[in-house]
A protein has these predicted regions:
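N-terminal export and membrane-targeting signals
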Residues: 1-9
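N-terminal "mature head" segments of proteins
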Residues: 11-153, 160, 166-169, 175-206, ...
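Repeated scaffold domains used in trafficking and secretory/extracellular systems
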Residues: 72-85, 119-146, 192-219, 246-267, ...
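Structural motif
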Residues: 96-102, 161-178, 228-235, 267-281, ...
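Short loop/turn segments that connect beta-strands within beta-propeller blades
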Residues: 106-108, 180-183, 237-241, 281-286, ...
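A structural motif specific to WD40 beta-propellers
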Residues: 110-113, 185-190, 244-245, 336-339, ...
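Long, well-ordered mid-to-C-terminal structural blocks that present hydrophobic/aromatic surfaces
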Residues: 323-362, 366
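C-terminal closing repeat unit and adjoining cap/tail of repeat-based domains
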Residues: 324-329, 355-357, 365-376, 393-461
Length: 461
């Protein structure tokens, strides 16, 4: 296929499935069904849509996969995940027999394996459960996890299992676990696991909705978290299928992350992080904090977890009790302080990490853990808008977007976190930033306003 510049061409690629096969969504699961299209090539040709990308990436070198079956509006997170250790990209696709997960090498695009087709639990809307009556479809999604030295792919969906016209079904998150090193086609999962939940509505994209259902590995193995009417947290052993529902520790707070030493919780009143019976976040407070700090003050508020590191916020002496501009990073297992920085107005809690774990960020605050150095990217005297970090490479190049408000082009920036002052550099208009930065390649997601999602995996120069 001739190479074309992104724009109207994107719609054509998503409609034709160029770069890999795409089947209509299975009947009754968000589509009208239909016959299978041609099989995806084991090694795809280069990108047919040339995106505007940061200068470190080659727009015409790499591969792409279109997910034309996806609706324009959906409540789940995008059905794409990466294996940072294995250098792989996993995504959910469809056949006439059900949903499949497919895994490719990021560097070559070669297909490692395709799962057998699967019909997920009945969605909440179809089951008539809860109060959800919106127009956003709830779709299966995919995550990756690392346990006992091995990486796994987890195909998952939220919905109602069982039930009939008389009896209520059981609300669950169903997990299908595949070893990342599997190979072949129609691969069966090594384990199927049902996690009982009480969300009463659809899961939300990137945790932005009221139910905030997440299936992620925060550095201690796979975990399922949900809010809704009853908040819950479950750690999952993907090899045995056993689950830890945070019963004892969560009597004192909300479960945030399971570590090798126990559960980190945030207490119900002030959201302060602690591991009950082991440590409290204020045991190793960052320098520059408020002299009036105690366990009844909002010092050490939980923000997020990534790669075994906790991010928390604190008061400062200058700010008093009215703001928490001090941001700290702690070891999630021990609570020990690793780095901190004072920013003007830190914002955002979606944490990201470089594949090697040296660099992490949450919203407008980023850290080089090797240098124990922080960078503030919030708006201030010299910056008109917040910079929200989306991804970080192993060499410390962070990519982010300007928080410009609804309906406006966010603008793209890059930041060097490895040295210097970490000042953002504005990229040309229309530049897309990678959703994930893998060694040697960036993964870009481009939604179509009508329907479909284009995955572009582009090589670094």
């Amino acid at each position: 296929m001739p190479k074309v510049v992104a724009g109207a061409a994107l719609a054509g690629v998503l409609l034709t499935g160029c770069g890999g096969a795409d089947d209509p969504a299975p009947t009754g699961k968000g589509g009208e069904g239909g016959k299978k299209t041609s099989a995806a090539p084991p090694t795809p040709s280069g990108p047919s849509v040339l995106l505007t990308v940061p200068p470190a990436y080659s727009a015409d070198k790499g591969w792409e996969q279109s997910l034309a079956w996806m609706p324009a509006k959906y409540s789940s997170k995008p059905p794409v995940a990466v294996g940072a250790r294995s250098g792989t990209v996993a995504y959910v696709n469809t056949t006439e027999d059900g949903y499949v997960v497919q895994v490719r090498d990021a560097s070559s695009g070669r297909i490692r394996f395709t799962s057998e087709p699967w019909e997920p639990p009945t969605s909440m809307a179809e089951a008539g459960n809860g109060t959800y009556d919106g127009d956003e479809a709830e779709l299966p999604s995919v995550s990756t996890a690392f346990q006992d030295g091995r990486e796994y792919v987890v195909l998952w969906a939220h919905g109602v299992q069982g039930g009939d016209a008389l009896a209520k079904g059981k609300e669950v998150v169903r997990l299908l676990v595949f070893p990342m090193d599997a190979s072949g086609s129609a691969v069966a999962p090594k384990r199927r696991i049902d996690i009982p939940v009480e969300v009463y509505g659809p899961n939300s994209e990137k945790g932005k909705g009221q139910d905030d259902l997440r299936v992620e590995d925060y550095g201690g193995g796979l975990q399922v978290h949900w809010n809704g009417l009853k908040k819950g947290a479950v750690a999952v052993d993907v090899t045995s299928g056993t689950i830890d529902a945070c019963a004892d520790a969560c009597a004192e707070g909300r479960g945030q992350v399971k570590t090798s030493k126990g559960w980190v919780v945030s207490n119900y009143v002030l959201d302060l992080a602690e591991m009950p019976g082991s440590w409290h976040i204020q045991d190793d407070a960052p320098p520059g904090g408020w002299s009036m700090m105690d366990k009844s003050s909002m010092d050490g508020q939980y923000v997020s977890t990534i790669g075994g590191h906790l991010l928390t916020r604190w008061h400062t002496e200058a700010g008093g009790n009215f703001s928490t501009p001090l941001v700290a990073v702690h070891d999630a297992a021990t609570g020990k302080l690793e780095a901190s920085i004072v920013c003007e107005r830190p914002r955002g809690d979606d944490a990201v990490s470089s594949p090697n774990g040296r660099f992490i960020a949450a919203g407008t605050v980023a850290f080089d853990l090797q240098r124990r150095h922080g960078t503030c990217l919030d708006a201030g005297e010299s910056r008109k808008a917040d910079v929200l970090v989306r991804s970080i490479t192993d060499d410390g190049t962070a990519y982010g977007e300007l928080a410009t408000g609804p309906g406006k082009d966010p603008g793209a920036v890059e930041i060097d976190l490895s040295a210097g002052d970490g000042a953002p550099r504005l990229l040309p208009d229309g530049t897309r930033v990678p959703e994930w930065a893998l060694p040697g390649a960036g993964v870009f997601l481009t939604p179509n306003p009508v329907n479909g999602l284009l995955i572009s995996v582009l090589k670094q120069k």
